[in-house]
Amino acid sequence: MNAPVWWQQLLLAMTGGALGSGLRFAIGASLIQRFGNVFPWGTLTVNLLGSFVAGVLLVWLDARGPSSWPLRALLIVGVIGGLTTFSSLMMECLVFARTDRSTMIGIYLAVTLLAGLALVFAGARTGQWLVTR
């Protein structure tokens, strides 16, 4: 990849990351306001939403070929990367452990991983449907 293209994709990823992080903050704050902070609904929601959308985008953009690389940088690396959060998932598991709710760790991880996997595959099927329309 030549330098101008690399810089272009870096700027697209950074722009998308800012948008995704802002979205994560807004979704998380909204869910805390609605449901309280007893369970990390915000992180679960953004990670599951991101899994589905990543599946859609990966298949849809893959069908567009190499010309889709700028969109991949913006949408997958940037927006979805900024929206989803592995570190928050891990910190929330630590909070569960430190507040004597260790049994929640397994439940939270299982729901996140199993539902995330199901949603990324559902997203891929949706993306394939969009491509073949």
Swiss-Prot record:
It is found in: Cell inner membrane. GO terms for cellular component: plasma membrane. The keyword Transmembrane applies. GO terms for biological process: cellular detoxification of fluoride. The keyword DNA damage does not apply. It is a multi-pass membrane protein. Na(+) is not transported, but it plays an essential structural role and its presence is essential for fluoride channel function. Coiled coil: none annotated. The chain crosses the membrane at residues 12-32, 41-61, 76-96, 104-124. Pfam families: CRCB. One of its GO terms (molecular function) is fluoride channel activity. It comes from the Bacteria. Disulfide bonds: none annotated. Keywords: Cell inner membrane, Cell membrane, Ion channel, Ion transport, Membrane, Metal-binding, Sodium, Transmembrane, Transmembrane helix, Transport. It catalyses: fluoride(in) = fluoride(out). Na(+) binds at G81, T84. HAMAP family: FluC. Fluoride-specific ion channel. Important for reducing fluoride concentration in the cell, thus reducing its toxicity. Belongs to the fluoride channel Fluc/FEX (TC 1.A.43) family. This is Fluoride-specific ion channel FluC. It comes from Xanthomonas axonopodis pv. citri (strain 306). The lineage of its organism: Bacteria, Pseudomonadati, Pseudomonadota, Gammaproteobacteria, Lysobacterales.
